[in-house]
């Protein structure tokens, strides 16, 4: 959870627990909530809740990025759905600028709505500069998947790019804090769907 979203943690746990007991998805699959864990400053995980016990979250913290590496591999583990000129961007058309512009917008919105201090950055300048970054290598493929929308009573296409992009660290310093934060966000069409 980001910033002010942490205030809603007890309600999210309760809602999730109720939802999984009732069944989720088109086939009403049932699950059991056994534990909730929170990431610690050192990158580990600490249990903060088990059913029948009190919720004991640690205070939220803002992680500090390490120094920018000399070389960087961006892993796209979940489908990244980007649009460029009203078309979905495939593996052959991938450009770092599109990824970075979406990531910067996503982080900016998260900070605007979930933090007490607005993000101060040259958004236009950073976005323009992102289009000048070239990847060393890209091993991307399209991964198609669907999700069921109860509201629309239909399956929705949610496919996107998965794989990895290798970047030379030279010139990445202005982008690094956002790329590093991006490991905890989604960036692209449908990002709010998780």
Predicted regions and their residues:
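RNA-interacting cores
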Residues: 1-194
């Amino acid at each position: 959870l980001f910033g002010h979203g942490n205030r809603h943690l007890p309600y999210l746990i309760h809602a999730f627990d109720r939802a999984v007991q009732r069944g989720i998805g088109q086939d009403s699959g049932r699950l059991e909530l056994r534990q909730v864990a929170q990431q610690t400053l050192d990158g580990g995980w600490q249990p903060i809740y088990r059913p029948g016990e009190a919720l004991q979250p640690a205070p939220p913290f803002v992680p500090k990025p390490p120094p920018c590496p000399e070389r960087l591999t961006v892993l796209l583990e979940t489908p990244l759905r980007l649009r460029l000129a009203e078309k979905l961007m495939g593996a052959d058309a991938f450009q770092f600028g599109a990824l970075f512009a979406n990531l910067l917008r996503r982080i900016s919105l998260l900070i605007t709505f979930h933090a007490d201090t607005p993000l101060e950055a040259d958004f236009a300048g950073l976005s323009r500069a992102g289009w000048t970054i070239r990847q060393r290598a890209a091993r991307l493929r399209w991964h198609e998947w669907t999700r069921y929308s109860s509201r629309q009573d239909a399956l929705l296409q949610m496919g996107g790019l998965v794989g990895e992009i290798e970047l030379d660290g030279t010139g990445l310093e202005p982008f690094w804090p956002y790329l590093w934060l991006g490991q905890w966000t989604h960036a692209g069409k449908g990002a709010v769907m998780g």
